[in-house]
Amino acid sequence: MRRWGLWEQETNVHTVAESDNFQSFPDRVEILCLTGTESFDVKGQQLIKTLQKGFPTKFLSSQMSSKFGLAGGIPERRVRPIWDAIDSRQFKNALKLVTSLLAKYPKSPYALALKALIHERMGKTDEALSVCLDAKELLYKDDLALMDDLTLSTLQIVLQRLDHLDLATSCYAHACGKYPNNLELMMGLFNCYVREYSFVKQQQTAIKMYKLAGEERFLLWAVCSIQLQVLCDKSGEKLLLLAEGLLKKHIASHSMHEPEALMVYISLLEQQSKYNDALEVLSGDLGSLLMIEVDKLRIQGRLLARANDYSAAVDVYKKILELSPDDWECFLHYLGCLLEDDSIWKYFDNIDQIHPTKHIECKFSHLTEEMFDSRISSASDLVQKLQRDAENSNLRGPYLAELEIEKRKFLFGKKNEDKLLESLLQYFLKFGHLACYASDVEAYLQVLSPNKKAGFVEMLVKNSDSSASATKVLGQTTTILKVQELTGNIFGLPTDEIEASAVKLAKLYCQNLSLSKDLDPQESMFGEELLSLISNMLVQLFWRTRDFGYLAEAIMVLELGLTIRGHVWQYKILLLHIYSYVGALPLAFERYKALDVKNILTETVSHHILRQMLESPMWVDLSNLLKDYLKFMDDHLRESADLTFLAYRHRNYSKVIEFVLFKQRLQHSNQYQAARVEASVLQLKQNADSFEEEERILENLKSGVQLVELSNEIGSRTLKFNEDMQTRPWWTPCPEKNYLLGPFEEISYCPPKENVKEEREENMKRAIQRKSLLPRMIYLSIQCTPTALKESVETNGSGGDIDVCEELKCLLEDYTKMLGCSLSDAVEMITEISQGARTSESLGSNLVDWLNFAVFWNAWSLSSQEHWHVLNSLFERLILDRVRSMGSSDMSSCYSDVQVLVQIITEPLAWHSLIIQACTRSSLPSGKKKKKNQHSDQLSSSPISQAIKDSIQLLCSTIQDVSNWLLNQLNNPEDGQVEGFLTTLKRDGNAAGPGQILGVLESFIASSEESEVGNRIFQALKSWNTADTARKTVMAQQRVLREFLQICESKRKLLETLKQQMSHV
């Protein structure tokens, strides 16, 4: 997939600092990155590649040897063995050696820094920090001979890992105060400010270095720091004038010597909309710094267009297209300038590589029809010339340009649908066998009417070349099916036609399997996409008929594909979502792990599995998933400054801006914020049966205050949606939507995969904010109980400490506001549902959130019997309705109900049980042998005591009903379930329904010869077993049920214990 590959490439660019190799690099590499040796700058790019490959660090010995003599006067021969021991991870030996070194040099800050580094590597963080502070104290003494860059850089490494970068910064600042003319120390201080993202102090330090050394690079460091202030801190744009003045003064006295410096200057002028000034710079002597003519022309064209000199920009872009006819972005710029349409710049300014839009706005209102015709005719002439020049090549750009022109005509109102269809057909005849055809024409299909879309599919079928080579016929057939999916035409076909089409594709796949017999397993096979298309058809057939056999058949088809070639990510993602739907979540998680998601892909791809895991009882796997994701994100956010500083050092200033903005984008990721909250809530869910453990967790969470602060922060910021939704199946375009859960009548066409960021952002923000309030509300609810019980006995008041109750009420108001209503309306809603006046459907997809509200609303006024009754009725109604809805259904057809029950029992019911535990603890005598006092006697007869007992009894009974359903499912013999799974695929003779594709595949496998398909494919075909696949699916479903049953039994036992304790009250 094109964009998947894009992110794999970007991983290497953006995440050197957090890659697996980087984490294990010896510290010498890190120290070398911090030092000021010129040899480091000379071959910076080579060093980055070396870092990425994890190259051994012995080659650094020569550079390091020159530094060792400066480390407080310690000879290199005494230090080298310590570094060798650290490099080989022999930390005990290294500690022994450094202890010996300190005996000889007790006042050496460098020796102490080495000791701190060793302690940190051994996981002794407290000892490491203590030693760092000792070294810092020595550095602050008057003996200037003890202060050198190697000591400071070693301390910086340790302190950064200990999250005390401020101490390292203070050490460097002190050193720079002592050595105001030491460039190396000032560079170290600049690096500290880079790590702190302190752009103002970066600027100030860079200016000092520039004044000291007069080097161009330090001035550009300052300019980049100013640009970052404007971009990230939203500082006044007057700073840009300051930066421009500094550059002009430098150019007047020293000129410029690097292309990157020129690019910074031009970007600075562009930020201020000084396009004519930028053009003047580019056309002057400095323009000669850009050696590649096309690059220079692109900049010139952009500046001319933004200066509204469209005619000159058109001439420039024509030159570029003559030099590079396949430059698609350039053609769009050319056409935009020709039509004086500035919307193209808005598109490219805001282009999102994760969510690229297929539609580009076009403006025509300012053009008369005559003007439009004249200019579009000029564009057509250019395109025809480019096509003639590229006639014997495989360039798609000139032919795609013809489609763009026809689309512009159509949007202008020329009513040229037939001409556009003809151009699409011609493009098919030339490139229809390529896998990219469907994605190339998607934007042009969207402007056609439904009838024309259906007619276009028929045109493709009629004009496909059956006499061409087998690979070309296969490619064209695949393209036609993909276009049929894009147009939604397939959703209007009768069921039997879809079945027939799927069978035809299965036969085509089998017939062409021999074309791939000599391919390497890593290479894509011919017709590989056919199995994905077949599975999409089968899923649609299931949606229409609710016949589980179609889903089972889709599973079999995709598993066969993975058996033949296990590297196809499309098969894994489709299986992941099908397994998730039928409740075989362990297999779904297995398929996700098989994607081998690493680095930035954890941010863009984990949406495929995260939501399902959050709604499942598979807490161990969920915990690992969250830990891995948060570790990558936290490591990147902590260490991304390493790469930013490398960009500064290597004079790659555009990357400086890019890396900082990329870091900010990840930092504001909605998924990252959600995962941080979910990780904390998961801990509470896992330990909800132990009151003492919950208190410990809440204490670690600062009583939930930190997450409340996070909720407030999220409310005032714009979240970034980095998930790559283009990789999701059609039936679940985003994690919150699954068309299979509703009837087929609700949608009659395949929804276009469009950017859903705008419509999701507010909902996601509110969901994260609501979740962030849970730990604090749990804490406050627990704090309310002792006073509430006391006041219930003494005054029958509302109960609870006034301040605590007031805060809880405020949070409840915030919570309901995030649910879209007021507190009073929310109370009315849950009351009516508990009484049966409204159905649970009124709660929508936020059912669990509403139940959470009801739990804490009850905790806010524990002495109200009415509140207890409403809450009890809600639990009973919402849980038993689901149990009755599932009835005798098997897991495959009711897993969505199981997901809801899992959430109810592990969240609101768990929090309510926790509050009951707090009530029980407060109501019981503190000593085992202590007799009941008067307060206890009064409590036993108080209304609240009876309400607690009734609630415990109801919850026990309700959970037992859930457990009974789970036991009924688990008591079904595994072999019987496997047989039932396979029975859905069996059919009589030529009857329609599930099993037809499976029949084609099984017949082919039975008759296939090794000489025909090759040894590897032949062995894979013979190893494929439908019974094994069915058994794995059933076992995965049973594992989910067992995990859920274990949770239910744990809750029931807790409630039984609480029932016994309350009987003594």
Curated annotation (Swiss-Prot):
Ubiquitously expressed, with a higher expression in vascular bundles, hydathodes, leaf primordia and the base of the trichomes. It holds the Pfam family TPR_16. Keywords: Cytoplasm, TPR repeat. It is found in: Cytoplasm. It comes from the Eukaryota. Disruption phenotype: Leaf reticulation, mild leaf folding, early flowering and aborted or unfertilized ovules in siliques. No stunted growth or enhanced resistance to pathogens. SMART domains: TPR. SUPFAM superfamilies: TPR-like. TPR repeats lie at residues 294-327. InterPro entries: NAA25_NatB_aux_su (IPR019183), TPR-like_helical_dom_sf (IPR011990), TPR_rpt (IPR019734). Its main location: cytoplasm. One of its GO terms (cellular component) is plasmodesma. Auxiliary subunit of the NatB N-alpha-acetyltransferase complex. Required for flowering time regulation and for vegetative and reproductive plant development. Belongs to the MDM20/NAA25 family. This is N-terminal acetyltransferase B complex auxiliary subunit NAA25. It comes from Arabidopsis thaliana (Mouse-ear cress).
